[in-house]
Amino acid sequence: MIFSHIIDRFQLKFKDREAAGNILAESLKNSIKKEERKNTIVLGIPRGGVIIGSTIANKLSCDFGIIVPRKLHAPHNEELGIGALMEDGTTYLNETLVKELEISPEYIKKEKLDQLEEIRRRTQLYSDKTFDWNQNDLSGKTVILADDGAATGATIIVAARYIKTNKNPGKLIITIPISPKGTINTLKNEDIDQIEVITIPQNGNFRSIEQYYQNFDQVTDKQVIDIIEGNLE
């Protein structure tokens, strides 16, 4: 695995998601040669990862699309992810956390059904407006997964597993501006070829992705659609 940790400053704050995407794109230019970029696709995770991904794709002149995993939330705490899933049922669970919180199988089953509904809603909303990578052969291609940060890594992990299992990419790259050290260590154990991360705080210093952005406004479905349509022009 190739691992690139770009900046080591705890106080670093990105102006916004586009600024973070530009830093990642500059780093990726060193590892993806110009002639390889025609065989590369960037997949952004909605919603914030779509801004990161589209910025990278535009800078590198690559194809761009979206991939829609969903976080599985802990009971009574929507900010805490206990895992994630894809529309086909591919699931990642943080078994340690599930055990610590004594989360029942019944709760997980219902949460999966709820999140599958949201996956289908978003997929239907976005699908006719983006490059349909899911219907295209990605065998041998370089696939870049982009998000605006990885707190637990659950959505990135489940998306990576889905692509590796179903799409046979030549290379799979994870690009994230911010992720705590413990999550990076978890990602390193996955079947991923390259990780690009800008800053890695120690676990005790990390509270949320938002604290590393000056502007972390919520991204709307309309913004996602506008970005997708802009990439198709």
Where in this protein do the model-derived segments appear?
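PRPP-associated nucleotide enzymes
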Residues: 1-233
